[in-house]
Design a protein with these regions (language model features):
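Flexible "arm" and connector segments at domain edges
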Residues: 1-63, 67-155
Length: 155
């Protein structure tokens, strides 16, 4: 896949049209926060409509618009300079949901069964074991899952 440079492209738009780009992580004024949430909700509604209409062109448009508005929010919340590091930490955390061994996967299945009766199944692919909830095929976190530590990055 080709790499996307959405933050810098949207920063160009913000600079051109005078939209805020904050240099330090912060929560903007309530009206700006409400605008950001409203814009994201609007684009998400367009995605839902495009999916319902089975219209791939409109799906692509909605996804691009969501990425554009989301990138604008990252800039307006002053997260632009730290976003790669933040995203990489979320990626690391998400990947820790996978199990490194069949034993870890079996312990994970037992953990969910003992915790609340959740039935799970193990799937191995390329030396990685994944645990899925049987009811809906949702990925379940390994017993060795490690949550993202975004706080240390934002300090």
């Amino acid at each position: 896949m080709e790499k996307l440079d959405s933050l810098n492209q949207v920063a160009q738009f913000h600079t051109t049209f005078g939209a805020p780009i904050l240099t330090q992580p912060t929560i903007p004024a309530a009206e700006r926060c409400n605008l950001r949430v409203s814009l994201l909700a609007e684009e998400l509604d367009e995605l839902k409509e495009a999916i319902a209409a089975n219209d791939l062109v409109e799906v692509a448009d909605a996804l691009c618009d969501l990425q554009y508005v989301l990138s604008g929010a990252v800039l307006e919340f002053g997260l632009g300079e730290k976003f790669v590091e933040l995203f990489n930490e979320v990626q690391r955390s998400n990947m820790s949901k996978a199990c490194a061994s069949i034993e870890e996967a079996e312990y994970t299945v037992k953990f969910y069964q003992d915790k609340d009766g959740t039935e799970a199944e193990i799937k191995e692919e390329n030396g990685v074991w994944k645990v899925y909830r049987k009811a809906d095929n949702k990925v379940l976190k390994s017993i060795n899952y490690s949550p993202a530590d975004l706080k240390s990055i934002l300090k």
